[in-house]
């Protein structure tokens, strides 16, 4: 029996990596989202999806999964922590990676 829901354990490392890619200047938020939509046939990109879920919820899930598993891939990227602390939570706050 494994801790955490299967979808969360697959989805949140992808969201986390998209944040790291953005932070490191490898790709823009738009490029990352577009790449996953067209390259992987996802209905929306990882950053747009994170903002739909709520960046605070994403952070809480990553922190819990990281604590429970110790898996480095679940350790929240620092920009996510900073954004949540600043109240930039995504769609419900009107701003996150994107403005709504």
Q: Whereabouts are the PLM-identified features?
A:
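NAD(P)-dependent Rossmann-like dehydrogenase/reductase catalytic/cofactor-binding core
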Residues: 1-5, 13, 19-24, 28-100
């Amino acid at each position: 029996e494994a801790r955490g829901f299967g979808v969360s354990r697959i989805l949140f490392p992808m969201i986390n990596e998209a944040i790291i890619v953005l932070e490191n200047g490898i790709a823009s938020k738009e490029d990352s989202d577009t790449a996953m939509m067209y390259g992987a046939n996802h209905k929306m990109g990882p950053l747009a999806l994170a903002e739909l879920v709520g960046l605070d919820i994403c952070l809480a899930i990553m922190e819990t999964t990281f604590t429970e598993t110790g898996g480095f891939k679940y350790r929240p990227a620092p920009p996510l922590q900073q954004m949540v602390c600043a109240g930039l939570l995504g769609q419900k706050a009107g701003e996150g990676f994107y403005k709504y």
